[in-house]
Amino acid sequence: KHTPGLKAVWVTPLRALSVEIKQAAERVADDLGTGLTVGIRTGDTSATEKNRQKAKMPDLLVTTPESLHLILATKGYEAVFKGCTAFIVDEWHELMGSKRGVLVELALGYLQNNISNLKIWGITATIGNIDEAIEVLLPNVSKKIKIVSKEKKQIEIIPVYPDKVDVLPWAGHLGGSLADKVAEIISQSRSTL
């Protein structure tokens, strides 16, 4: 049976990603019929929504490192997090080694001392040294598990140059003249960055 209250925190470095994560989590919850609720807490969250969350936290809270710290600094935060069992850090490679990453590390250390059996997930698509990333995220966790995709992607780099350059602009204007060439490459690709 579903019991209301915060069960998981999903930290993302980008507020724009928080909306996508919320929508994806809501689709899964709806498809599975779990009744789980999802909320967002960022600098963009209205005072009305913050008050609603204060009265009744969602099951999954998608937030940023800064907003998480504001919640932790709130009187009575212990009651908010008492039922939390999962902590997900998205785009860990973006946060690691930065001030925002330190905020995540401090929050995790604080929560680990107050929540027994907290499961911590670090998610990243691009990281050079995964062992170091795990150690930074989970310094006090004895059992660490890596899940690494074996999929090898073929990467093709296609430089795009103008057909003719009389004067090379200093900045900003060269890209516009290449838009048609870039659009053609994108239309022929499954995935383009």
Regions found by a protein language model. Name each.
Residues 44-62:
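Conserved motor-coupling elements within RecA-like helicase/translocase cores
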Residues 61, 65-69, 75-120:
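SF2 helicase catalytic motif II
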Residues 14-18, 23, 44-47, 66-69, ...:
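Conserved nucleotide-binding/hydrolysis micro-motifs of P-loop NTPases
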Residues 109, 117-193:
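Conserved interdomain linker/interface between the two RecA-like ATPase lobes of SF2 helicase motors
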Residues 10, 40, 120-122:
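Structural beta-sheet core signal
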Residues 17-42, 135-142:
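Conserved helix-turn-beta segment of the N-terminal RecA-like "Helicase ATP-binding" lobe
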